[in-house]
C-alpha cells in the first residue's frame, strides 16, 4: 500500500475553521491600510536569486543559511522569496512607480525560510508588509507606527505589545561604529560563542542580537551606536521620538536593536510581545533609503515594515479569546418532501439576489428536519429557512431563529426583508 503523502515539515495546511479567523484579522488589517491611503501590490513568489543577495546582504543569516534556492531548466538561479521588501522595490523600479513619485504600498502572502520549525515560526509563513517610497522625514516613520498601533487596538492586543526603537544612522556612521565594535570584541574573544566569533568580522552588528546571556552581559560595556550617529540621523530620530510622544505612543529605546537585514538605515523598530512565552517580534521594520538605488533605481527615500501573520493570529487567540471568526453561515435553507428541493434552490437564489451580503447555504444532503437543523447548527447558522410541501404550495417559508428557537411563517416574498432585520 502506497504511503500517504503529507505536507512538508514547517509548511502547514490551514483548515476552514482556522482560515475564517485569519480572514477576519486580515480584513481589519486591510481596512486600516486603506484608511491610511495604502494600495495593494501583488508580487511573484519566485525572484532571481541576485535580488535577495544584493538587497538583504550576502553575509546575513537569511542569505547564507535560510533561502530556498534552485536552478531552473535554463540554469538561472531562482529563490522562493524570504521577505517582501526586495521584490516590492524591484517591481517599483521595473514599472516606473518610484521615479519622482510618492507611493504607499502593501502586500500579503507566503514567504519561505529554511528554519527550525517552532511555534509561530515556520518554513512557509505568511507576511503582510507596508512600504512607503519618496518621503524622507520622521513624520512618515511615525505614521507607520501609528498605523500599526491602530491595528493592535482593533484586534484587542494593545496591552500585550511594546514598541522598541533605535537609530542605526548612516552608512558612514555604521562603518565607524563597526570598527569600534570589532576592536572591542577582539579584546574579549574568549567570552564569545562560536556564532558570535563567526559574525565578528562578517557582520559584527548582528552580535548585538545574540541571545547568549554571557554575550549580552559583555555588551553592557561595549561602545554604543548612539555615540557614533551623524547629526542628521540624530535629528531624524529625535523628531520621530517627539512625534510619538505627542501621539501618546509609549516606546523604549533599545540600542541593541539593529534588525537582521543589511538594507536598513536610520530608524529601526520592533513591536514585541512576551505573551507567547519568550519575547517575540510581532511586527518590525525601518528605513532603507539606499535600497532603491542599490537595486538600480534612482536614489529614493523609503521606509516600511512587515508582520508575520502566524504569530499575530497566535497572539490574538492567546490574549483576546473573545475575538472570534465571523459566522461561517448566516442562513441555512432546509427542505423535506416532494418537490421541495428545487423550491429551496430557487428561494436561496432569490434571497442571494436581494441580500448578496448574506452567507447562505442550502442543504443538499437529504435527511429529516431534525438532522438538517443539526447540520445548520454545525455550520454556525443563525437562521434556518424551512420548506415543506405545505410551504411550497402556499409560497411560504418558516423562518427559525436558531439561537432563540423562535419561528414564524412568512410569504417567500417577505423573507429577505425579515432576514435583514434579524441579521442586521
From Swiss-Prot:
Full protein name: Histidine--tRNA ligase
GO MF annotations in UniProt: ATP binding; histidine-tRNA ligase activity
Family statement: Belongs to the class-II aminoacyl-tRNA synthetase family.
Pfam families given in the database record: HGTP_anticodon (PF03129), tRNA-synt_His (PF13393)
Record HAMAP family: His_tRNA_synth (MF_00127)
Enzyme class: ligase
Keywords noted in UniProt: Aminoacyl-tRNA synthetase, ATP-binding, Cytoplasm, Ligase, Nucleotide-binding, Protein biosynthesis
NCBIfam families: hisS
Compartment(s) where it occurs, according to its Swiss-Prot or TrEMBL record: Cytoplasm
Gene Ontology annotations for the cellular component aspect, listed alphabetically: cytoplasm
Amino acid at each position: 500500500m502506497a504511503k500517504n503523502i503529507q505536507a512538508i515539515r514547517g509548511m502547514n495546511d490551514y483548515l476552514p475553521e482556522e482560515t475564517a479567523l485569519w480572514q477576519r484579522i486580515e480584513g481589519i488589517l486591510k481596512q486600516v491600510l486603506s484608511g491610511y491611503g495604502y494600495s495593494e501590490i501583488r508580487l511573484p513568489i519566485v525572484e532571481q536569486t541576485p535580488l535577495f543577495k544584493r538587497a538583504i546582504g550576502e553575509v546575513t543569516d537569511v542569505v547564507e543559511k535560510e533561502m530556498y534556492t534552485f536552478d531552473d531548466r535554463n540554469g538561472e538561479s531562482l529563490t522562493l522569496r524570504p521577505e517582501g521588501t526586495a521584490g516590492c522595490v524591484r517591481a517599483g523600479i521595473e514599472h516606473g512607480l518610484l521615479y519622482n513619485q510618492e507611493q504607499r504600498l502593501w502586500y500579503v502572502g507566503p514567504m519561505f525560510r529554511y528554519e527550525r520549525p517552532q511555534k509561530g515560526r515556520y518554513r512557509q509563513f505568511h507576511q503582510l508588509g507596508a512600504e512607503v517610497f519618496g518621503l524622507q522625514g520622521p513624520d512618515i516613520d511615525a505614521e507607520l507606527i501609528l498605523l500599526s498601533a491602530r491595528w493592535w487596538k482593533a484586534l484587542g492586543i494593545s496591552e500585550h505589545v511594546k514598541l522598541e526603537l533605535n537609530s542605526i544612522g548612516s552608512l558612514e556612521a555604521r562603518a565607524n561604529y563597526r570598527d569600534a565594535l570589532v576592536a572591542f570584541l577582539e579584546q574579549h574573544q574568549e567570552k564569545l560563542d562560536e556564532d558570535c566569533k563567526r559574525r565578528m568580522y562578517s557582520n559584527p552588528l548582528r552580535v548585538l542580537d545574540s541571545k547568549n546571556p554571557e554575550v549580552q552581559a559583555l555588551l553592557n560595556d561595549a561602545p554604543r551606536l548612539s555615540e557614533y550617529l551623524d547629526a542628521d540621523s540624530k535629528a531624524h530620530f529625535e523628531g520621530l521620538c517627539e512625534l510619538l510622544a505627542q501621539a501618546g505612543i509609549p516606546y523604549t529605546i533599545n540600542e541593541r536593536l539593529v534588525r537582521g537585514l543589511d538594507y536598513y538605515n536610520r530608524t529601526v523598530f520592533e513591536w514585541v510581545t512576551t505573551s507567547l512565552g519568550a519575547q517575540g517580534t510581532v511586527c518590525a521594520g525601518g528605513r532603507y533609503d539606499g535600497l532603491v538605488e542599490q537595486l538600480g533605481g534612482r536614489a529614493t527615500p523609503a521606509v516600511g515594515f512587515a508582520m508575520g501573520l502566524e504569530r499575530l493570529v497566535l497572539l490574538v487567540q492567546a490574549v483576546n479569546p473573545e475575538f472570534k471568526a465571523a459566522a461561517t453561515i448566516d442562513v441555512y435553507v432546509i427542505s423535506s418532501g416532494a418537490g421541495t428541493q428545487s423550491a429551496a434552490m430557487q428561494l436561496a437564489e432569490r434571497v442571494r439576489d436581494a441580500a448578496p451580503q448574506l452567507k447562505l447555504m442550502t442543504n443538499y444532503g437529504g435527511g429529516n428536519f431534525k438532522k438538517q437543523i443539526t447540520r445548520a447548527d454545525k455550520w454556525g447558522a443563525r437562521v434556518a429557512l424551512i420548506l415543506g410541501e405545505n410551504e411550497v404550495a402556499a409560497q411560504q417559508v418558516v423562518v427559525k431563529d436558531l439561537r432563540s428557537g423562535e419561528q414564524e411563517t412568512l410569504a417567500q416574498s417577505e423573507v429577505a426583508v425579515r432576514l435583514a432585520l434579524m441579521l442586521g
